[in-house]
């Protein structure tokens, strides 16, 4: 039974995404349905966590929009994600960057990896 589930989920995994880690700045192109039409919305922000593994892997991206912090958690292998672009690579020493929620302005910056 476990082998059948593994075979089914292996077909659903997406391999077209780039490697990214917490601290990286991403542009996530998400398909959004509005009424009867579908468009692509770009959500750009810092990855604050990656969670789980396999087909159920998710990641959370945080950005500041009009002075308000916005976080979006997305399934990595979702068909709703059109593409993911890494715009900056960041240096961090943590796997979960929850402390960024309490920082404002220049204090919330992350150093860039060379």
Curated annotation (Swiss-Prot):
Belongs to the bacterial ribosomal protein bL19 family. This is Large ribosomal subunit protein bL19. The keyword S-adenosyl-L-methionine does not apply. The gene is rplS. GO terms for cellular component: cytosolic large ribosomal subunit. The keyword Transcription regulation does not apply. It comes from the Bacteria. GO terms for molecular function: structural constituent of ribosome. This protein is located at the 30S-50S ribosomal subunit interface and may play a role in the structure and function of the aminoacyl-tRNA binding site. One of its GO terms (biological process) is translation.
């Amino acid at each position: 039974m476990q082998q059948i589930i593994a075979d089914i989920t292996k077909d659903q995994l997406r391999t077209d995404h780039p490697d990214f880690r917490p601290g990286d700045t991403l542009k996530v192109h998400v398909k959004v349905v509005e009424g009867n039409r579908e468009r692509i919305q770009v959500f750009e922000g810092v990855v604050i966590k990656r969670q789980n593994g396999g087909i159920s892997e998710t990641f959370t991206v945080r950005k500041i929009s009009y002075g308000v912090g916005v976080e979006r958690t997305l399934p990595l292998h979702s068909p709703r994600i059109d593409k993911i672009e890494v715009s900056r690579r960041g240096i961090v020493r943590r796997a979960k960057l929850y402390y960024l929620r309490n920082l404002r302005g220049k204090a919330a910056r992350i150093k860039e990896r060379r």
